[in-house]
Each structure stands twice: as structure tokens, then as C-alpha cells.
A protein has these predicted regions:
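Conserved nucleotide-sugar donor-binding
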Residues: 1-12
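Basic/Trp-rich segment in TM-proximal cytosolic loops or flexible interdomain/linker regions
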Residues: 49, 54-104, 128-134, 164-167
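Membrane-embedded multi-pass helical conduit in multi-pass membrane proteins
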Residues: 86-159
């Protein structure tokens, strides 16, 4: 992120109270103050501690997802948090359809919701990519939403008084 120091200080810098998403929140304030956010693909970004395994990726997304759960407002404004909620609902429908007698009709509904969520996410992000790449990224979106929905479960556990643990 490149920004004049004076403007950064005028906006109050990053909100240090935020566990995650402080850069996104800062950009929202900058836009509200009249800044234009421009993505320059020629600039290279290095992320330290980039996940090297699927488990690390899911854990990182679970941590990132906690930023969307600061308040009901941030939750409702986050397409990702809403997508993670749909992910959980789809799995609840699938499991209910599989394991509760007389509820088999919920199985196709849950599968449809899950497929639509993954397809819409993949289409939005990779609509210009080759078809085989879209299928692979659909699988990665499954892991992405698995991590993001884990942060929702983390919040529910914390609110219920249980000690949450992200594996």
C-alpha cells in the first residue's frame, strides 16, 4: 500500500484494536475521505508465513474470518462471512438429509446450495480462467469457506462459554 504519510496520519493510521482486516478497514476510511484505491499488478507483494499446506491455509482463513465477526454490521457487510454462513447451512442440510429419518429431501437442497456457492465464488474470481482452472479453484474455495466458517463456529463456541480451539 502506497500512501502519503500525511494522509495516513490524518486518517489515524491502522486501527490497532483489530485482530485482522486492519488494511481493509483502513482502505474503507481512505475511500470515504476521497482516496482512490488502485491495484497495480506490476507491484510485487511478499506475504511472510504464506501457508504451505492445506491445513495451514484453512487455519489462516479461520483467523482472517474473525475480522468479519467484530459486530453484526461488519458481518452483514461481508460477502465472505455471508458465504461462510451459506456454507454452514448447506452442510447442515446435507448432514440432516443423510442422518435424520424422513429428511432425505434436504440432501439435494444442501448439495445445490453448496454447488451454487462454490460456482458463484469461482466465477466471480476466475471467470476469465480456463475451465479446468475453475474446477481446481472451486476446490480451493471449499477449503477457503471451511476456514471462514470455522471462525463462525469459533465465535458461537466463545459466546456459549466454551473454550474454543482452532485445530
Amino acid at each position: 500500500m502506497l500512501i502519503p504519510r500525511e494522509f495516513f496520519l490524518q486518517l489515524g493510521g491502522f486501527d490497532e484494536r483489530l485482530e485482522t482486516g486492519e488494511d481493509y478497514e483502513f482502505c474503507q476510511r481512505a475511500c470515504a475521505a476521497g482516496a482512490d484505491i488502485v491495484n497495480n499488478p506490476q507491484l510485487r507483494v511478499v506475504h511472510h508465513d504464506f501457508p504451505r499446506t492445506l491445513r495451514q491455509f484453512i487455519r489462516r482463513e479461520a483467523w482472517h474470518g474473525r475480522g468479519d465477526l467484530r459486530s453484526l454490521r461488519t458481518f452483514l457487510q461481508s460477502k465472505v462471512a455471508l458465504g461462510a454462513s451459506a456454507f454452514l447451512v448447506a452442510h447442515a442440510l446435507i448432514l440432516t438429509g443423510l442422518f435424520l429419518p424422513g429428511m432425505l429431501s434436504l440432501l439435494p437442497l444442501g448439495l445445490l446450495l453448496l454447488i451454487l456457492l462454490l460456482a458463484a465464488s469461482t466465477w466471480k474470481k476466475y471467470r476469465y480462467a480456463p475451465w479446468h482452472s475453475r474446477f481446481v479453484n472451486g476446490g480451493l474455495f471449499y477449503a477457503y469457506y471451511l476456514g471462514r466458517s470455522a471462525s463462525l463456529l469459533y465465535l458461537l463456541q466463545r459466546r456459549s462459554g466454551r473454550t474454543p480451539r482452532l485445530a
